[in-house]
Amino acid sequence: MAFIAALGLLMAEICPAVICCSDGTLGMHNAVQKGQDTQKQLDSLTLASINTDFAFSFYKELALKNPHKNIAFSPFGIATALNSLTLGAKGNTLEEILEVLKFNLTETSEADIHQGFKHLLQRLSHPGDQVQIRTGNALFVEKHLQILAEFKEKARALYHTEVFTANFQQPHEAMKLINSYMSNQTQGKIKELVSDMDGNTSMVIVNDLFFKAEWMVPFNSDDTFMGKFIVDRSRHVKVPMMKTKNLRTPYFRDEELKCTVVELNYKGNGKAMFILPDQGKMQQVEASLQPGTLKKWRKSLRPRKIKELHLPKFSLSQHYNLEDILPELGIRELFSTQADLSGITGVKNITVSEMIHSTELDMTEKGTEGDAITIVGYNFMSAKLKPVFVKFEDQFLYIVLDQGDLWIHVMGKVINPSEK
């Protein structure tokens, strides 16, 4: 299984005046330590819980705007890009971003939030020799625009952000530079993150997340067959259906929400949770998505023998303009002329004109090589439960999680596995 997520923020100068020239380069800088000695560091599990809250809020808005489409997005990627932007946001612009990301400054300081992300990014940068996880941030700046040294230093130290200069007066040249960078970062998976740009753009921030892992118990490709998948009451499609028999894996039947939850582990640091609502119950399950729901599912999962598991093989490619989505959640000023990003340039002359998020997700029988881990916590009584058959032949949800902190890397919904 592999996924790649990328996000781009296009910013424009509100005023057309030319600002002092900057070379846009960065030197080496030690990690920012401000606040760490006096503030309690944000616990990684708390950070993951906050991210889950944001992830589910964002998902619900996506589902509302895309009721009949597959969904794939990276809450981690979006949160990382937005949070790096808070290094330069001020006033109400900053407050709106933090509120939508579910942070409460009365409980956690900005310094602790940034330190929490920094340590998480450091951990993800060293997942082990076999697991492939890579994150990256890049800032493309108009060659005549001056970026504050403090912002560049913190962006580099906390979010591993690279800074490049670009000639946005030549939009096609700038787009070529950005898309070439993203293509290299995503191994050619995302070749055209930015497809349109005008001469008013002065800054672009992009974020990418690459994750690839192998199932702990891979599906046998010889068992994959063409099976029926129900798109809606009047339509079904034939899709490649992966199959495995006599699998022992975490399972939970949620009678309250009328859905079945199955968890499959990856070799290495990750797991995938698949949620199959009973027919006609998808909206009920979606409405219930909140951190407490995920916590309940995680606590209720028990090893269970699945006599036969069917899961469609699918490949999704989704592209979202977040300037149409985030204002509905509460981030409005960022996309208006009232935006205050003076912590980036020193003056209030930058606004975000476009924010793009792209995700490529492949769910296959095997994946790539990785270190094996051992499933723990078996319940002796579960051996007395009858084996079950689980067939994902109707629309379902999926959540890819970090094994340790339960951070949501990617999540979404499959309505039609035959469509990208």
From Swiss-Prot:
One of its GO terms (cellular component) is extracellular space. Glycans are attached at residues 104, 349. SUPFAM superfamilies: Serpins. GO terms for molecular function: serine-type endopeptidase inhibitor activity. It comes from the Eukaryota. Residues 367-392 are annotated as: RCL. Its main location: secreted. The record marks 381-382 as: Reactive bond. Keywords: Glycoprotein, Protease inhibitor, Secreted, Serine protease inhibitor, Signal. Residues 1-17 form the signal peptide. It is found in: Secreted. The single human alpha1-antichymotrypsin gene (SERPINA3) is represented by a cluster of 14 individual murine paralogs. The reactive center loop (RCL) extends out from the body of the protein and directs binding to the target protease. The protease cleaves the serpin at the reactive site within the RCL, establishing a covalent linkage between the serpin reactive site and the protease. The resulting inactive serpin-protease complex is highly stable. Variability within the reactive center loop (RCL) sequences of Serpina3 paralogs may determine target protease specificity. Belongs to the serpin family. This is Serine protease inhibitor A3B.
